[in-house]
Amino acid sequence: MLTWKAGKSARTAQNGKLQFRFLGSSGMRTLHWIALFLLAVGPAAAADLDVTSMGAVGDGKTDCTAAFQKALDAVAAKGGGIVNVPAGHFRIDGRLKIPGAVTLQGTFRTPPTDQREDRPKLDGSVLLAFAGRGSRDGEPFIRLAGSTATLAGLMIAYPEWKQTDVPPVPYPPTVLTQDTVNTAILDCCFLNSYEAIRYQSAARFLVRNVHGYPTFRGLYVDACYDIGRVENVHFWPFGVTYKPDDPFCKWVNVNGVAFEFARTDWQYVVNTFCFGYGVGYKFSRSQAGSCNGNFLGIGADSCRRAVLVEDSQYPGLLITNGEFVGRWGSDDSVCLEVAESASEGKVSLNNCSFWGPIDRCVWLRSPAVQFTAIGTHFREWDVNRRGIPAIQLDAGKAIVQGNTFGRGDLHVLVGPKVRSAILMANQAAGGFNVDNQAAGRTQLVANEQNILDTSETAKSHYRLDIGAPDDNRYVRKCFAPESCQYGERSDKTIRWSTSQTEFHLPVLRGKPYTVNLDLNLPQAAVDPANGLYLGDQRVMELPAKAYLGTVTGRLPACDKDHVILTLKVKTWCPKDADPNSKDMRRIGAALCSLTMKADGAGDGVTNANTGDAE
């Protein structure tokens, strides 16, 4: 029992034989027996063991399962502490359980990776995993078996893994925890795990500074109801000779998932990145439900679906500062898809960027979800040149505000089932182009316009320089711009046509037009059916032989403000014509410029790309 005696000039605290005298009147304090007091009333010091003291050998050959588990259990028996793993290759034939309040700590204080200049050599603390080969089910390699259990500073590799095994041989999760709180994985590398990390019913977990290239799935979270955190995670082809067409890499790039979030509340994800997966960030629904959370500074490169939302909670998914790139060499990548199955919630993009080989940047399919994109840059899309929009809204509600658009023809498609779309203050090269099929349910306010939409003089006589900046408003379903290689036109740009390239052109109602098309028609593309068509009517015939120059046609008067002219050209493959060519495209004619002049128009011509009079 602790008692106090007070006097005129001093106070004394007594606890058994221990005394503390505080000299108040003189301002001096004398402290006796501090070390003994702390030992008497303070907690016992945490345990600290080295696995080698229990018989572990880092030679890569000796099974160290028993030694590791013995060390972990010994530290747990003393109330918790740290089990240190020195540098070496420690073979683990079985499985490990890290008890509560125990940390299995390797040498790393930063996330390790393989040494690319010497792949077989792995320095630092390395665990070699063998258990569970051939099945996704069963006990994990490491179980965080109690609350505040921690795995830190280790590299984990599977020596029996082979890049030539396609499909990859499955294993249970490398690390799993269930029905725990405040567990952590820090400064680790999962070199070639099948599934790296699984959190099930684990509140307030922390995953920080983790690298690796898990094959089937990197991280899975479900039934976590109290704010899990994922920070500085980088899933990239460490330990793999990466080529987009390699069978193993392609399997991961079609079937693998880097991050999957099912039921998790208030999920925080910060500064994460993945490369080469089928899905970068997947939001799914389990029996427990779906996700809401905050996703800041996330990135996905070379993914078929950078973000796939199968479902979300009503508070929604808040995505800020995201960077998304389509799968290398693909023609069907969608960077953000909100599936039809999504039953509620909101998906918000703020200050994100999209580029690379993308078909659609955003595809909203769910009738129940609200989508917003604010301050985001859509640089590239429509990799197949089929007239696909950057943002395709099939259903639901959307706000698209204050965004910028680069290369691409159609910026937003609003489908007939969309309940509300507000498109406001967007800038796009050549003018903000919207295909609105939802009538009055779409509101367009203060978006960048094209001069040909506002000036009848400009609309009466204009020239489109094909392949030059800002031509994408008018030209669709053709290939990307490239330099012209033909004589006097060598300072120009061109686009190669497809079999049916479209020109979306403004016209004056009731006025016929003379149409001049400057092109190069190779012999391989010559065909009697070639021509420029208005619907089924051919308004311009192309030469019956190879031709470099200008072809003229006549467009009859129309009762609309815009027309679509289709250039139909027989396609050919450059590699078929020249075995030394690496160009496997099916191309038609090289298009240099198109001039439209209404009957009665003056000689002054407007540059449709820039809006300037010439």
Question: Where are each of the predicted segments found?
Answer:
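Residues in short coils/turns that link rungs of repeat/solenoid architectures in beta-rich domains
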Residues: 111-112, 158, 163, 191-192, ...
